[in-house]
């Protein structure tokens, strides 16, 4: 039984390699706890990753910082980032935050949804590449 639980935990922690196009996901709301939802994947995936309507999914502030720390600028450098603030409810029904992410004079606004337990995004937002977690 322990092996089965350990194997399940490892599978749940695997990073996402491609955009999700169907099915339900688990979110963790500060007020409601964990719950399962079925997002409008067609509407979400019609927008670029990092848009307010397609925020980068992470788990809590450490997940936000971990994702942003893995981004790579065009020249190979590491971007600077700072939190701008919260921007209301996103497509998953939870609050999204925005970060300013800059490579020198080039800056982008990246929206993130931190209420996705056990989710690690492997895709970069437009304009960046990303290192493996």
Model-predicted regions and their roles:
Residues 13-15:
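N-terminal signal peptide c-region/cleavage motif recognized by signal peptidases
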Residues 19-95, 103-133:
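N-terminal secretory-pathway/extracellular module detecting exported/lumenal segments
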